């Protein structure tokens, strides 16, 4: 039998059709070689979303070998469009991880210089290795990689586990950066929430989340977000807050379906500004004490600050907020509970009382919000701050002073 150009082209078309049918994607291949019955090479691969035809990925060469009951795949210079990751993940999740017949054989995938393109730029990953390992009632996919500019030799680890042992199958993700920082902007197209942290925000630590039908939870315990732009977080809020912040989570388990929030951590922000309306809201709803310097009382506009330090502890509908400025270097001589300072002077003090979630929601809610402050500005908080199912007992009444405060009444009767 002679291998003619016509037959080669026909075989290439058949291969494209088979791969497209299996993956649910539009696969285009410039050329291929079949060296042995158990191996082949693909050249110039382009992967597209089948409905929009948007490019998802481009790969210079793929080497595929099946041997000893295991599949080995080598990708040469793959480039992925981050904007298409969310849709492609959902498709591959349903097509592969949810189908035991397609994950019955172990698979190892290696890639050199994987580039992830996003709206904010490109991130290149090196030493990329992935494994798909089937188990009796589950399948695990593990990815290890390093950012090309990383000084750390320990790879980032990502694991996806599809567990079928329970009453309902569930998919669990886990991410461990193992000392390496990841730019949040690289996955902002995949997780839009990351875009709200700013283009310079970075993540380090561990993250685990599980997805079931109509149920999800996430655990960020041990994680840290740095270089967070507070003005991006508050850009759709009626109050103003700016500065560069670091968020650290000692514990952080959020489970909206079970109405559970167990969060403990801190926020440290420097060189920013806080709107006067936000100060008033913190005073009226959380009992924070405001002591403005004389020169700031007569000025208009936002209040500048050198340091914002706040510890938080969320237990479902109960919240404790504690000023922690004195924990920072150079501020050790400050009194306890200082949450905001300027030019070496404390200007905001936290309250020791336990707050309910509605009090904190009312701080960031617009002035026109109703008793349960649901709005575009607070929607993202409703999964974190669980509204109480009944009125919570109040702490013993106490009056906190607001010396030199001319921004409005510190105590008012309900209208």
Whereabouts are the PLM-identified features?
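Detector for repetitive beta-architecture
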Residues: 39, 70, 106-108, 246
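Elongated, acidic membrane-bridging lipid-handling scaffolds
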Residues: 61-64, 92-184, 338-340
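Short solvent-exposed loop/turn micro-motifs enriched in small/polar/acidic residues
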Residues: 25, 55-57, 123-125, 200, ...
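Long, low-complexity, intrinsically disordered segments
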Residues: 398-415
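Terminal hydrophobic membrane-targeting helix
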Residues: 2-84
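Extended, regular secondary-structure scaffolds
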Residues: 83-91
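Short acidic, Gly/Pro-enriched loop/turn segments at secondary-structure junctions
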Residues: 71-73, 120-124, 258-260
């Amino acid at each position: 039998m002679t291998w003619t150009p016509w037959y080669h082209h026909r075989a290439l078309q058949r291969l494209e059709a088979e791969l497209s049918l299996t993956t649910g994607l539009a696969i285009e291949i410039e050329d291929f070689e079949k060296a042995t019955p158990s191996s082949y090479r693909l050249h110039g691969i382009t992967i597209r979303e089948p409905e929009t035809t948007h490019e998802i990925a481009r790969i210079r060469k793929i080497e595929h070998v099946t041997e000893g009951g295991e599949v080995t795949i080598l990708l040469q210079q793959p480039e992925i469009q981050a904007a298409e990751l969310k849709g492609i993940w959902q498709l591959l999740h349903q097509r592969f991880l949810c189908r035991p017949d397609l994950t019955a054989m172990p698979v190892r995938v290696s890639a050199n210089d994987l580039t992830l393109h996003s709206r904010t730029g490109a991130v290149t990953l090196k030493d990329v290795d992935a494994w798909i390992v089937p188990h009796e009632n589950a399948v695990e996919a593990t990815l290890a990689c390093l950012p090309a500019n990383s000084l750390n030799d320990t790879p980032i680890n990502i694991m996806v586990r599809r567990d079928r042992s329970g009453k309902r199958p569930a998919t669990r993700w886990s991410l461990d950066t193992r000392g390496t920082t990841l730019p949040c902007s690289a996955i902002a197209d995949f997780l839009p929430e990351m875009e709200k942290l700013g283009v310079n925000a970075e993540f380090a630590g561990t993250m685990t989340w599980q997805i079931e039908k109509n149920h999800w939870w996430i655990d960020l315990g041990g994680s840290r977000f740095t270089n967070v732009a507070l003005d991006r977080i508050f850009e759709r809020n009626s109050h103003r807050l700016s500065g560069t912040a670091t968020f650290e989570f000692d514990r952080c388990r959020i489970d909206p379906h079970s109405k559970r929030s167990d969060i403990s951590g801190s926020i440290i922000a420097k060189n920013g500004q806080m709107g006067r309306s936000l100060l008033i809201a913190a005073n009226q709803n959380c009992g924070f004490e405001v002591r403005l310097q004389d020169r700031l009382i007569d000025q208009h506009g936002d209040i500048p600050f050198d340091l914002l330090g706040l510890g938080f502890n969320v237990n479902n509908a109960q919240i404790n907020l504690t000023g922690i400025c004195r924990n920072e270097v150079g501020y050790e001589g400050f009194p306890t509970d200082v949450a905001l300072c300027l030019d070496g002077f404390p200007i905001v003090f936290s309250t020791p009382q336990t707050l309910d979630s509605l009090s904190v929601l009312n701080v960031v809610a617009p002035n026109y919000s109703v008793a349960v402050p649901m709005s575009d500005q607070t929607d993202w908080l409703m999964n974190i701050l669980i509204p109480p199912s009944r009125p919570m007992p109040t702490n013993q009444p106490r009056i906190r002073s607001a010396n030199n405060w001319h921004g409005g009444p510190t105590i008012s009767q309900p209208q």
